[in-house]
Amino acid sequence: MSIKEEIYKNYYEELTFDDPIDYKGLLLYPVSIRKINKFLQSSSVIRIQKEYIPDKEIIKMSYLKFLMTNIDKEKEEYGESLTFDLLALCFMICMRIEEISIRLFIDEDGKAKLILNDVEIDENEFDYLRKLILYQNLPNYDDELINPDLKNDLEQADKIKNGGEETEDFEHLIANLVIGTGMNIDDVKNLPIRKFYIIGQVMDRKLHYSIYKQASVGGFVEFKQPITHYLKKNIDLLENKVTTVETLKNNLNI
């Protein structure tokens, strides 16, 4: 079972109802939209895809040891570490605390360890913890490795699918949810990041479903495939890791 499957199995209710997750006595709360900028900035240190870094030693080492290596280098060169500060901020945001105690060290077996508010976390547990935080807050996060060339293809395919248009800035996304749901701005600002994006995605699917359905029923357009209801799980072309740009173009008749 992958970490993703394990997280969704063990914490399905917490993820669904935005409840805090208890991991080894550490309470992890879903981050609200009002703190999205700080969260995205601070969580950047736990979102690095180090497997794509062209260095065999980095690829082989655990994520926790990788962070410790960066922290040591920064302290040696600058006297302080931005990586350490961002890591601490990320934990404080997720745990909703104002102060935190973090100790990093290498044990007698050469393994990296983290003591977070008196809770000892080993290398495997840290990898699970960071992915738990990311799955709890980012609905489109996926820790599966993708071939770099295919990853580039998928990014291009995503642009094609969206007509080459950029997504509106965050302020406009908030306004869209206010208009589309009837919630006031304060309600939206208090939404967890995960729910904010899921609601936006469902609204978008509902709108397109209505347009396509009306066009089909009215005889304006004939679709090759039946129109899938917006609440049914749709197998997105981009979710298929073997989809290429050319395949997507053909499927979309571009």
Q: Model segments located where?
A:
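Hydrophobic, aromatic-lined core segments that form the binding pocket/scaffold
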Residues: 85-163
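Alpha-helical oligomerization segments
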Residues: 190-254
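Extended, charge-biased low-complexity segments
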Residues: 57-96
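Generic detector of well-ordered alpha-helical segments enriched in charged/polar residues
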Residues: 84, 88, 126-134, 171-175, ...
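Phosphate/adenylate-binding glycine loop and adjacent helical scaffold
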Residues: 48-53, 73-82, 122, 126
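A generic structural signal for solvent-exposed, polar alpha-helical segments
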Residues: 18, 29, 69-72, 236
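Intrinsic-disorder-associated interaction segments
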Residues: 57, 79-80, 118-126, 219-224, ...
